[in-house]
C-alpha cells in the first residue's frame, strides 16, 4: 500500500491481528501538494471576511469551487475516477494508490481506501490529520471488497459497504465498521441485502441505513433489521443523507413522482417535501432547509445550494462536462 510521508512507523499486535501504523501512509496523503486558497476557520473570521467568496481550483481538474469562510460545509476531498485528492492546510494533494478518501466531521481524521489488496485482504488507512500518523486496518479478505466509506457524525467510526463480485458486477453482501480509536474493523453479513445497497450512518451513529427494493431499511450494527420504509426511494446525499438536525433524510423519489428528490421524515418515513430540481447527484445537506445538488448548466454542470422547493440560492462549484463525464465527486464535510 502507498505510504504517507512523514509519519512515525510503529507496529502493534491486537486480538484482531496486526495493525500497522505507518507514518509514511499519512504522509502519502500530504505528498505532491498543489497550491490552493488557505481557509480561515469560520469561528475566527471577521464578518466582512466571512462573506468574501474565494475561488479554489481543484488540482487535476477544471473544477472551480466557490467558498466563504463561514460556510457550514466545505470540500475536504474529491475523486476523479479512481484518483483521490485530500485537502491539508487549504491545499489539495493527489493520493497515489488510493481510490477514495473521506474526511471525518471536524476534520481530525480521514479514511482512505487503497486501489489494491494487500496480503489477500482489503484494507483502509486511518489517518490522524492532527498528529500526522496513520494506521493500516484490514477490513475483509479476498474475494470481498469494502468501499464507499462514510463517517459517523462524532468521527469515531466509519462504515464501508462490503461487496462480492458476481460476473461483471459487484453485489452488496453487508458492511464493515471501522473503529478509529481501537484501529480495528468488523465485517457484518446482512441477510437479504439489496444487491445495490450502499450503507450509511443514521444520525445517532447506532444504526446504518441503505436502500432496499425502492425503499429504505435501517439495520443495527449486528446486521439485524430494525425497520423498513417501503416506497420511499433509495437514500441519497453525499457523506450524510440526514439533515443536520437528524429529523429528515434525502431519497431519490420513486419513478412515479414528477419531482426527482424527496425529503422523508426519519421517524416515520413519511414525505416531508418533494424537491423539484434537475439533480444529477446529491452531495448532502447545507442546513435543515437546504441541500447540495449537482445540476446541468449550459453544456456543463454546477454544484448548487437549493431550498426544498428546488430553487437554487448559490453556486458552490463550476464543473466542466469533461470532468463530470470522468466521474468527479466532491466530498463536502462539516468542519
Question: Where do the model's predicted regions map?
Answer:
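Secretory targeting and sorting signals
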Residues: 1-48
Amino acid at each position: 500500500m502507498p505510504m504517507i510521508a512523514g509519519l512515525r512507523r510503529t507496529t502493534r499486535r491486537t486480538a484482531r491481528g496486526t495493525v500497522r501504523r505507518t507514518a509514511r501512509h499519512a504522509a502519502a496523503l500530504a505528498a505532491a501538494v498543489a497550491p490552493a486558497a488557505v481557509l480561515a476557520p469560520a469561528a475566527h473570521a471577521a464578518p466582512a471576511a466571512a462573506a468574501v467568496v474565494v475561488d479554489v481550483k481543484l488540482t487535476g481538474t477544471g473544477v472551480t469551487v466557490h467558498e466563504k469562510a463561514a460556510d457550514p460545509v466545505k470540500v475536504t476531498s474529491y475523486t476523479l475516477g479512481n484518483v483521490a485528492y485530500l485537502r491539508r492546510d487549504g491545499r489539495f494533494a493527489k493520493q497515489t494508490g488510493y481510490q477514495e478518501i473521506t474526511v471525518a466531521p471536524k476534520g481530525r481524521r480521514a479514511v482512505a481506501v487503497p486501489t489494491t489488496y494487500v496480503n489477500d485482504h482489503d484494507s483502509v488507512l486511518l489517518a490522524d490529520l492532527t498528529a500526522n500518523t496513520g494506521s493500516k486496518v484490514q477490513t475483509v479478505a479476498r474475494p470481498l471488497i469494502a468501499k464507499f466509506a462514510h463517517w459517523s457524525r462524532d468521527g469515531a467510526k466509519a462504515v464501508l459497504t462490503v461487496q462480492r463480485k458476481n460476473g461483471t458486477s459487484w453485489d452488496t453482501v453487508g458492511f464493515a465498521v471501522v473503529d478509529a480509536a481501537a484501529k480495528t474493523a468488523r465485517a457484518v453479513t446482512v441477510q437479504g441485502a439489496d444487491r445495490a445497497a450502499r450503507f450509511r450512518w443514521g444520525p445517532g451513529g447506532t444504526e446504518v441505513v441503505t436502500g432496499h427494493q425502492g425503499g429504505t431499511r435501517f439495520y443495527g450494527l449486528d446486521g439485524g433489521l430494525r425497520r423498513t420504509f417501503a416506497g420511499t426511494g433509495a437514500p441519497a446525499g453525499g457523506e450524510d443523507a440526514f439533515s443536520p438536525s437528524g429529523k429528515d433524510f434525502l431519497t431519490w423519489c420513486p419513478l412515479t413522482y414528477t419531482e426527482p428528490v424527496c425529503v422523508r421524515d426519519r421517524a416515520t418515513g413519511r414525505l416531508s417535501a418533494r424537491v423539484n430540481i434537475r439533480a444529477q447527484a446529491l452531495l448532502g445537506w447545507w442546513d435543515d432547509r437546504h441541500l447540495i445538488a449537482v445540476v446541468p448548466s449550459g453544456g456543463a454542470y454546477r454544484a448548487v445550494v437549493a431550498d426544498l422547493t428546488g430553487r437554487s440560492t448559490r453556486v458552490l462549484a463550476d464543473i466542466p462536462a469533461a470532468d463530470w463525464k470522468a466521474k468527479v465527486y466532491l466530498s463536502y464535510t462539516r468542519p
